[in-house]
């Protein structure tokens, strides 16, 4: 299995093997097999670049608009969740591809060609794709039966996509690891493995530990000026799902999702279906919940993070749904969690 492409390089699983009174070696081996199988399957399901024999994946759905496809329950649930949340950003596939080109550029002049804020053609394209993405008559998902998905795409959008050479209408892009971490976590938990924590390099965490016997840590960083500063560590008990919205590059998966111009201007992956451009309300926002997975937590808070600025009132509303927030104002930590616990960094 080790040689097969999988999504595990983006994630770290830490597990307290042997704690349940069974052989540590045997438990580690069994857990490793389950986890690796899930990592291979997850990689395939959410892939937009190629097809695989054993699954119907996102690539297949993109290649067969207006056809009913039967998909794995994991992908069905992910698409249904995004659709139910009315998160139209899933339909910005062509603009995510363009953003990747921008972020992989070697210099500002090359990057600017893909930037709707700096290039007329790019601006025109962003506006066109956003207009299609906003309109359910142009693109939408239907779920006609159990694990069945149909991606409806209008003739007008198909013609435009063909003219522009697009290959993917649908792409989870920066949201993908939230759905993958939930799948990995739910898979091992379903097999009875609960004394573990999975984290992704781009800031998602699923802590499965329900014992309440162990304290876990999550680092708090804040971009102040052009310097990312450590502000200490949030302490928490499981189970928890943590989502980290950030307007700067934080981990290795971010290299092809963020770009910093020489003047300090950042481009981020948080594109909005309203105009096809990136929007961030603050340099960072951490949201977490003991009730929901990462995907639900992300979808509940995403629109708040895309606002002009963070609204304490809206974040309080989230807290009433048991989704808590941590953010910064004037370099001071703010939170909606009455039980928030953290250890400050020694300055």
Model-derived segments and spans:
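Mature catalytic core of soluble alpha/beta enzymes
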Residues: 1-347
């Amino acid at each position: 299995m080790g040689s097969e492409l999988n999504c595990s390089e983006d994630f770290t699983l830490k597990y307290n093997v042997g704690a349940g009174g069974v052989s540590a070696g045997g438990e580690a081996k069994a857990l490793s097999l389950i986890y690796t199988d899930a990592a291979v399957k997850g990689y395939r399901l959410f892939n937009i670049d190629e097809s695989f024999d054993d699954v119907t994946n996102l690539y297949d759905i993109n290649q067969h608009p207006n056809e009913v496809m039967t998909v794995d329950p994991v992908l069905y649930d992910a698409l249904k969740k995004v659709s139910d949340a009315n998160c139209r950003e899933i339909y910005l596939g062509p603009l995510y591809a363009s953003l990747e080109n921008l972020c992989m550029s070697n210099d500002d002049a090359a990057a600017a060609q893909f930037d709707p804020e700096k290039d007329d053609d790019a601006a025109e394209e962003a506006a066109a794709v956003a207009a299609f993405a906003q309109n359910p008559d142009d693109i939408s998902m239907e779920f006609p039966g159990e694990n069945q998905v149909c991606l409806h795409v209008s003739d007008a959008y198909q013609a435009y996509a063909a003219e522009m050479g697009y290959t993917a209408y649908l792409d989870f892009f920066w949201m993908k690891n939230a759905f993958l971490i939930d799948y990995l976590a739910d898979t091992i938990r379903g097999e009875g493995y609960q004394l573990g924590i999975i984290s992704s390099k781009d800031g998602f965490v699923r802590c499965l530990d329900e014992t309440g016997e162990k304290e876990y840590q999550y680092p708090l960083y804040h971009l102040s000026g052009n310097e990312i500063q450590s502000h200490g560590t949030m302490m928490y008990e499981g189970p928890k799902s943590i989502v980290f919205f950030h307007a700067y590059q934080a981990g290795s998966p971010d290299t092809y999702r963020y770009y910093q111009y020489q003047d300090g201007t950042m481009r981020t992956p948080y594109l909005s279906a309203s105009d096809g451009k990136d929007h961030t309300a603050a340099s960072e926002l951490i949201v977490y919940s003991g009730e929901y997975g990462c995907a639900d937590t992300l979808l509940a808070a995403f629109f708040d993070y895309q606002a002009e600025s963070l609204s304490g009132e809206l974040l309080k509303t989230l807290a009433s749904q048991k989704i808590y927030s941590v953010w910064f104002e004037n370099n001071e930590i703010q939170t909606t969690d009455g039980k928030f616990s953290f250890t400050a960094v020694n300055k």
